[in-house]
Swiss-Prot record:
PANTHER family: ATP SYNTHASE PROTEIN 8 (PTHR39937:SF1). Its main location: mitochondrion. The gene is MT-ATP8. Mitochondrial membrane ATP synthase (F(1)F(0) ATP synthase or Complex V) produces ATP from ADP in the presence of a proton gradient across the membrane which is generated by electron transport complexes of the respiratory chain. F-type ATPases consist of two structural domains, F(1) - containing the extramembraneous catalytic core and F(0) - containing the membrane proton channel, linked together by a central stalk and a peripheral stalk. During catalysis, ATP synthesis in the catalytic domain of F(1) is coupled via a rotary mechanism of the central stalk subunits to proton translocation. This is ATP synthase protein 8.
Amino acid sequence: MPQLEPAPWFSMLTVSWLIILLLIMPTIMFYQTQNTVSAQQATKPKQPTWTWPWH
C-alpha cells in the first residue's frame, strides 16, 4: 500500500506544517481585536429574565 511508505508524502506534510507554523501563524497572531472587553463595561440586564413555566 503506498500510504504506508512515508517517503513521498511525509516531507510535504512537514514542509507545509513548517510554513504554516513559522510564516502564517505569527502574521495571524499579530492582529489584535478592536473591541477590548473590561469589567467596567459589563452591565446587568435591566429586566429580569423570563422564566418558562415547565408543566
